[in-house]
Amino acid sequence: MRILGIDPGTLVVGYGIIETANDELTLVGFSSLTPPACAPIPQRLAYIYKGLVEVIELYQPDEVAVESPFADKNIKSALAIGKAQAVALLAAANHSLPVTEYSPACIKSRVAGSGNASKEQIQEMVRLLLNLAEIPQPNDAADALAVAICHHSQRAFTNIISQGDLT
């Protein structure tokens, strides 16, 4: 199974693609989309949409996983991220791809074993789980790979539960 993970944002959108087979994870690719920072939001969103469509058509994922925005103190930032998230959902939907959204705490828990894991811990776990020499750069791409790994972990857990094999 090929999973596209997306870390949405209006300034940088990270994406990462992994392949899973027999519980083994293989890195397929990763990068980021960086719309012009001076462009108005609608143009940035169009840039992100076009870029994600190109990624989907190039890598042909089976499923898409997207990080959901976290609204702590900066509501304006969360709303902007939500717009980029909506564009990611639209790109996947227009390609008939199943999409799952994950909260930052869920991603941290699934990847590092703790919903309170630091960004550095998550990035190191991404490096270890994908058997990489270095942490993927930019950070947004490493975060997107964490989203994809989270989705793989959640799917594996759901499969175990659905089969009734809790031993």
Swiss-Prot record:
Alphabetized Pfam families for the sequence: RuvC
- The residues that cross the membrane are none
MF GO annotations: crossover junction DNA endonuclease activity; DNA binding; magnesium ion binding
Location(s) in or outside the cell? Cytoplasm
Q: Catalysed reaction(s)?
A: Endonucleolytic cleavage at a junction such as a reciprocal single-stranded crossover between two homologous DNA duplexes (Holliday junction)
Q: Does the keyword Transmembrane helix apply?
A: no
Q: Indicate yes or no for the key word Transcription regulation.
A: no
**So where does Mg(2+) 2 get bound?**
67
Q: Which residues form the active site?
A: 7, 67, 140
Subcellular location, principal: cytoplasm
Q: How is the cofactor bound?
A: Binds 2 Mg(2+) ion per subunit.
Give the enzyme's EC designation: 3.1.21.10
- Residues the record lists as binding Mg(2+) 1: 7, 140
User: Which cofactors are reported in the record for this sequence?
Assistant: Mg(2+)
Its cellular-component GO annotations read:
cytoplasm; Holliday junction resolvase complex
Keywords, A to Z, come to:
Cytoplasm, DNA damage, DNA recombination, DNA repair, DNA-binding, Endonuclease, Hydrolase, Magnesium, Metal-binding, Nuclease
Q: Which Gene3D superfamilies match?
A: Ribonuclease H-like superfamily/Ribonuclease H (3.30.420.10)
What Gene Ontology biological process does one annotation of this record name? DNA recombination
Quaternary structure, per UniProt, is: Homodimer which binds Holliday junction (HJ) DNA. The HJ becomes 2-fold symmetrical on binding to RuvC with unstacked arms; it has a different conformation from HJ DNA in complex with RuvA. In the full resolvosome a probable DNA-RuvA(4)-RuvB(12)-RuvC(2) complex forms which resolves the HJ.
What family is this protein classified in? Belongs to the RuvC family.
Q: What functional role does this protein have?
A: The RuvA-RuvB-RuvC complex processes Holliday junction (HJ) DNA during genetic recombination and DNA repair. Endonuclease that resolves HJ intermediates. Cleaves cruciform DNA by making single-stranded nicks across the HJ at symmetrical positions within the homologous arms, yielding a 5'-phosphate and a 3'-hydroxyl group; requires a central core of homology in the junction. The consensus cleavage sequence is 5'-(A/T)TT(C/G)-3'. Cleavage occurs on the 3'-side of the TT dinucleotide at the point of strand exchange.
Q: This protein is called what? A: Crossover junction endodeoxyribonuclease RuvC
Q: Which organism is it from?
A: Dehalococcoides mccartyi (strain ATCC BAA-2100 / JCM 16839 / KCTC 5957 / BAV1)
